[in-house]
């Protein structure tokens, strides 16, 4: 391509004029068959491009566009990564801010609770400090500077905010030189922190209230221990600040608050129960309260046997001796048995004392034929129409007292079924049947489920039945008729199998109590690991990702023990569990 060929069509056009129309036409017709005619047909001012140059330029343009697209995609990807990183940091900072705000609120509430005379000015100063710090953060952003200045001008600033040298910092971000002394007034956050720690320890110990009731009651009943604990907390305030100042400014929220730690510890703490679901580890049958109540049942059985023997002896004496001698002897023996029962059952002592003064015509007491299990209980006193609002037996109606005296007389003269305070007891029933029922359910001796809510007669109807009862008493007071109606009774001491079964049940209950005592131990041994320490040991394992956390938690729950600080596990058990799960 040359310069002359490019300018030729333009020169030819300028050479031709309107006067030379024939020449131009002839020239145009002559050039129609030549190669120059093709060049003349193109638009003027356009340079003709060769094929190689055009292809090369197209390839360069496409390469440049491709490189631009790659750079744009790479830049967009970097921006997207940066945005996602900033979003995660923002979410983490928001979560941390929310946690710290809640912590400050809890500290203020605890401070108000333990120091109600605290002036409200401190709260307002703290809130003003927080507001000023937020204002400083807004001023650093140019977008919100105008709005922040307008808000600051519309409100009156307090004297605390007017200090320009103030800078709010968290304790772990402060320098050791700037930490206030414990004796100054600015130690209220530290005091509230120690109070919060003390409250947290109390809340943790309350989760195991069923297992460590005695230790907690002792510690809470002595105010000197509480005062000593609070004084030690306040004395360690400076050490707390110095420890927190060594922490880096970057708060590792994920490592400090791992969700898996809380789930693992919540599952492991089920071995000791929780506040919402206090499940004891032992069965309800073997609780100490029930075993303490049922301990003297063997002694009560012996007393019943002695009572039956005394009745038989007194009747034998009545046939050959005067009536007052036999009555005095049996009264003496029965008085001893009642004293033995009253010593074992302190709950029924008042009832025995009140009813002991009422003597029957034969000289026997009302409660001489009443065993410990026939004393008034909730079901008896709570559903009587004459004692709904007065549970004192001395203030009962005269009709009820007369009824009890009449039935007591009937019981003392004959071996017919006796009625004591609404409960029927047949001393002539073979005691082997009672022992067999006791062996089926050793925790509830001689209790019939039908007597849970006895059917009492209305005291208003006792007036109509008084004549029938008097007639029955007169008929039963005949000694000859009593001897005719007498039925043989079988003493309890002649059944060695029952005594062996009772001893076995007592041994089982004692062993259950020992197991409960062994499960409740203080967590002051260095070999016992708390839940957080167990989790640290599990996560530090090199093959942590291969562990079955749920199975490991279930295995450790069976070996966990309850302490005052929560659930603890022996270090050897943790190591054995890790080894067994890695095989």
UniProtKB/Swiss-Prot annotation:
Coiled coil: none annotated. Residues 54-77 are annotated as: Basic motif. Residues 8-17, 47-58, 67-84 have a biased composition (Basic and acidic residues). Transmembrane segments: none annotated. GO terms for biological process: cellular response to stress. Residues 1-86, 177-233, 275-329, 350-373 are annotated as: Disordered. SMART domains: BRLZ. Oxidative stress induces conformational changes through oxidation of cysteine residues, masking the nuclear export signal, thus abolishing nuclear export by CRM1/exportin 1. InterPro entries: AP-1-like (IPR050936), bZIP (IPR004827), bZIP_sf (IPR046347), TF_PAP1 (IPR013910), Yap1_redox_dom_sf (IPR023167). One of its GO terms (cellular component) is cytoplasm. Disulfide bonds join 265-531, 272-562. Residues 37-46 have a biased composition (Basic residues). Residues 51-114 form the bZIP domain. It comes from the Eukaryota. A motif (Bipartite nuclear localization signal) lies at residues 41-48, 120-127. Belongs to the bZIP family. YAP subfamily. Contains two cysteine rich domains (CRD), referred to as the N- and C-terminal CRD's, n-CRD (Cys-265 and Cys-272) and c-CRD (Cys-531, Cys-553 and Cys-562), respectively. A nuclear export signal is embedded in the c-CRD, with which the nuclear export protein CRM1/exportin 1 interacts only in the absence of disulfide bonds (or otherwise oxidized cysteines) within the c-CRD or between the c-CRD and the n-CRD. Transcription activator involved in oxidative stress response and cadmium resistance. Regulates the transcription of genes encoding antioxidant enzymes and components of the cellular thiol-reducing pathways. Activity of the transcription factor is controlled through oxidation of specific cysteine residues resulting in the alteration of its subcellular location. Activation by alkyl hydroperoxides or cadmium induces nuclear accumulation and as a result YAP1 transcriptional activity. This is AP-1-like transcription factor YAP1. The gene is YAP1.
């Amino acid at each position: 391509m040359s310069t002359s060929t490019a300018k030729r069509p333009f020169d030819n056009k300028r050479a031709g004029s309107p006067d030379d129309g024939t020449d131009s036409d002839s020239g145009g017709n002559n050039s129609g068959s030549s190669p120059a005619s093709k060049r003349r047909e193109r638009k003027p001012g356009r340079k003709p491009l060769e094929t190689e140059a055009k292809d090369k330029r197209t390839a360069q343009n496409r390469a440049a566009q491709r490189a631009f697209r790659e750079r744009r995609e790479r830049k967009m990807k970097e921006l997207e990564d940066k945005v996602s990183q900033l979003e995660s940091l923002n979410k983490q900072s928001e979560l941390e801010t929310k946690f710290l705000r809640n912590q400050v609120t809890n500290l203020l509430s605890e401070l108000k609770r333990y120091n109600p005379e605290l002036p409200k000015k401190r709260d307002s100063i703290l809130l003003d400090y927080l507001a000023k710090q937020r204002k400083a953060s807004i001023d650093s952003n140019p977008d919100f500077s105008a709005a922040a200045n307008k808000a600051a001008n519309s409100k009156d600033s307090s004297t605390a905010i007017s200090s320009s040298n103030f800078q709010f910092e968290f304790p772990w971000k402060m320098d050791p030189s700037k930490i206030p002394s414990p004796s100054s007034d600015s130690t209220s956050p530290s005091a509230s922190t120690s109070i919060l720690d003390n409250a947290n320890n109390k809340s943790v110990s309350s989760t195991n209230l069923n297992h460590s009731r005695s230790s907690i009651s002792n510690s809470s009943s002595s105010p000197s221990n509480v005062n000593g604990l609070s004084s030690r907390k306040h004395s360690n305030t400076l050490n707390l600040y110095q420890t927190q100042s060594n922490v880096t400014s970057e708060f590792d929220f994920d490592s400090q608050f791992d969700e898996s730690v809380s789930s693992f510890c919540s599952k492991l703490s089920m071995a000791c129960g929780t506040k919402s679901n206090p499940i004891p580890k032992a069965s309800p049958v073997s609780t100490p309260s029930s075993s303490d109540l049922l301990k003297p049942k063997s002694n009560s059985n012996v007393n019943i046997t002695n009572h039956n023997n005394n009745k038989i002896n007194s009747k034998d004496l009545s046939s050959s001796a005067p009536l007052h001698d036999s009555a005095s002897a049996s009264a003496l023996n029965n008085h001893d048995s009642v004293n033995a029962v009253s010593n074992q059952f302190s709950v029924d002592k008042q009832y025995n004392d009140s009813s002991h003064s009422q003597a029957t015509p034969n000289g026997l007491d009302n409660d001489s034929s009443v065993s410990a299990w026939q004393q008034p209980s909730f079901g008896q006193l709570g559903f009587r129409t004459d004692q709904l609002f007065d549970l004192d037996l001395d203030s009962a109606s005269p009709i009820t007292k007369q009824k009890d005296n009449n039935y007591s007389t009937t019981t003392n003269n004959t071996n017919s079924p006796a009625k004591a305070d609404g409960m029927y007891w047949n001393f002539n029933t073979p005691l082997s049947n009672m022992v067999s029922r006791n062996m089926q359910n050793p925790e509830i001796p001689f209790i019939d489920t039908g007597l849970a809510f006895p059917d009492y007669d209305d005291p208003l109807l006792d007036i109509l039945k008084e004549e029938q009862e008097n007639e029955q008493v007169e008929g039963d007071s005949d000694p000859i008729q009593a001897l005719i109606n007498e039925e043989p009774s079988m003493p309890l001491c002649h059944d060695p199998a029952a005594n062996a079964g009772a001893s076995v049940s007592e041994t089982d209950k004692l062993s259950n109590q020992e197991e409960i005592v062994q499960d409740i131990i203080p967590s002051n041994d260095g070999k016992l690991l708390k839940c957080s320490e167990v989790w640290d040991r599990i996560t530090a394992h090199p093959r942590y990702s291969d562990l079955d956390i749920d199975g490991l938690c279930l295995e450790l729950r069976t070996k966990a023990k309850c302490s005052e600080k929560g659930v603890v596990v022996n270090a050897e058990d943790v190591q054995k569990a890790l080894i067994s799960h890695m095989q």
